């Protein structure tokens, strides 16, 4: 029997005093993935990104910081999770390779 992972997506907006009404859109908004499959989550900003943060929240637990991206073209990886920042498109993508049950949870992006 194949395991099905549920990944919920959310937006976590950080506001600095000099940034007003930063809007982030994450897509897809929800996702169900079979174990072993790859998945990609995108986070797009309405304004210039100076820093983008990815978090994960397991059911019933607090936020877990995954990574921070600050430079355009920057790419970081940790435990089958890779994130990349594209400043020109004002977006970041989070890619999970060969998903496992430990990847289930809510993924959030935040920006400043």
Curated annotation (Swiss-Prot):
Descriptive protein name: T cell receptor alpha variable 34
Q: Mention any one GO cellular component term assigned to this protein in its UniProt record.
A: T cell receptor complex
Q: Where in the cell is it found?
A: Cell membrane
Signal peptide from the UniProt entry: 1-21
**Gene3D superfamilies xref list:** Immunoglobulins (2.60.40.10)
Q: Which residues form the Ig-like domain?
A: 22-112
Which cysteines are cross-linked by disulfides? 43-109
Glycan-linked positions: 38, 42
- Looking at the Swiss-Prot or TrEMBL record, what is one Pfam family this protein matches? V-set
**Major location category of this protein:** membrane
The task this protein performs is described as: V region of the variable domain of T cell receptor (TR) alpha chain that participates in the antigen recognition. Alpha-beta T cell receptors are antigen specific receptors which are essential to the immune response and are present on the cell surface of T lymphocytes. Recognize peptide-major histocompatibility (MH) (pMH) complexes that are displayed by antigen presenting cells (APC), a prerequisite for efficient T cell adaptive immunity against pathogens.
One GO biological-process annotation of the entry reads: response to bacterium
Instruction: Share what the entry says about its subunit structure, partners included.
Output: Alpha-beta TR is a heterodimer composed of an alpha and beta chain; disulfide-linked. The alpha-beta TR is associated with the transmembrane signaling CD3 coreceptor proteins to form the TR-CD3 (TcR or TCR). The assembly of alpha-beta TR heterodimers with CD3 occurs in the endoplasmic reticulum where a single alpha-beta TR heterodimer associates with one CD3D-CD3E heterodimer, one CD3G-CD3E heterodimer and one CD247 homodimer forming a stable octameric structure. CD3D-CD3E and CD3G-CD3E heterodimers preferentially associate with TR alpha and TR beta chains, respectively.
Cross-referenced SUPFAM superfamilies? Immunoglobulin
Q: What UniProt keywords are attached to this protein's entry?
A: Adaptive immunity, Cell membrane, Disulfide bond, Glycoprotein, Immunity, Immunoglobulin domain, Membrane, Receptor, Signal, T cell receptor
Is Signal set as a keyword in this record?
Answer: yes
Q: Does the keyword Signal apply?
A: yes
What InterPro entries does the record tag this protein with? Answer: Ig-like_dom, Ig-like_dom_sf, Ig-like_fold, Ig_V-set, TCR_alpha_variable
């Amino acid at each position: 029997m194949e395991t099905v992972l549920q990944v919920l997506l959310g937006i976590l907006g950080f506001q600095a005093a000099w940034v007003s009404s930063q809007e982030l859109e994450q897509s897809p908004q929800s996702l169900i993935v079979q174990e072993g499959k790859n998945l990609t989550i995108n986070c797009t900003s309405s304004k210039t990104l100076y820093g983008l943060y990815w978090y994960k929240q397991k059911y019933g637990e607090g936020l877990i910081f995954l990574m921070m991206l600050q430079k355009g073209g920057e790419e970081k990886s940790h435990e089958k999770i890779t994130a990349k920042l594209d400043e020109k498109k004002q977006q970041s993508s989070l890619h999970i390779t060969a998903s496992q049950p430990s990847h289930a949870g809510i993924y959030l992006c935040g920006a400043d």
